[in-house]
Amino acid sequence: MKRMLFLVLLGAAQVAAAQSTLEAVRARGFVQCGVNTGLAGFSLADSKGVWRGIDVDLCRAVAAAVFGDARKVRYTPLTAQQRFTALQSGEVDILSRNTTWTITRDTSLGLNFVGVNYYDGQGFMVRKDLGVASALELNGASVCVQTGTTTEKNLADYFRANNMELKSVVFETNEQARQAYDEGRCDAYTTDASGLAA
């Protein structure tokens, strides 16, 4: 019986926190939404500074639900390193950006994941002249990757599991990692498959 009571109280605390956030949003007059620093199709500011993409549209939908006006939203571009801290500190009200939902994150961050809006997988980009047809052929390769991501962890785990040598070249943003790859600073670039296609 004590266990069930604890779960109910924990649930009540989470509802109270959500109500407190909603009250703060209503008092402020807009939703502060954390988004990716720039990922085509998900969250990217165009040449006029207008944010576009599925993650941005979700932010607009929340604003429409709260205020009846999808324009009552402001965007805070966040790196992978910044995203959870920004949400925990109240810098943003919601986080709508590419974020892998893991059991560790679900249980240790004190945040509520509300659902999945896109399923993705990790991939690699290599130059054709490297002659690589499989990730198993990347032993000893230098790989550009964004730090603080499950992509970085998965990369290390994959190389370790296959007894391969890895030379990670880490960057704060995916844009920086992609640019370094384009400049030839890495043999390969890894991120979500959607990011490779963008």
Residue ranges and their predicted role:
Residues A45-K48, R60-R71, F113-G115, T151-V170:
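Ligand-binding cleft/hinge of the Venus flytrap
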Residues R71-T79, V145, M164-N174:
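Short beta-strand-to-loop elements that line the ligand-binding cleft
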Residues R60, A64, G68, K72-E137:
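Acidic, polar ligand-binding/catalytic clefts
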Residues G38, S47-K48, T100-W101, R127-G131, ...:
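Short coil/turn segments
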